[in-house]
Amino acid sequence: MGLDMYLHKVKEVAYWRKANAIHAWFERNCGEGELGNCEDCHVSKDDLLKLKDDCQKVLKSSKLVYKEVPVKEYDSNKKEFVEVMRTRKVLDDTSLAEELLPTEAGFFFGSTLYDEDYVESLEETVAQITEILEDPDIDEYSFSYHAWW
């Protein structure tokens, strides 16, 4: 029995901006369903492997195509958001994306379309996690996730 004291080094290893599907994945898989603003949750190496695998499955099964989709835009005359149809590059089949990495609406969370930005967030996730997993000292680290909005 004694006074044991520790100082830990914390380092950011991945960053996302408005990648709400990734946030929703962490909520479902690491945060017991919901994470509050700035709330930390533990992330294991196996969690990182699963997230990477889920992203790769969606990327492999999907193709971007041009399609008319409803989007919300601000109408300065009406001084409100209105729904309009716009041509966007979106996934031709969203079924696997909706199952493994569904988007999540939120005031600061960005678009919920399964579009080019969605695909880019999955590609960035795969790249970031690949780099993390390649670190020879990975088993010495502990990981946590939190989001700020």
Residues of each region from the PLM?
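Acidic (Asp/Glu-rich) sequence patches and key acidic residues
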Residues: 1-149
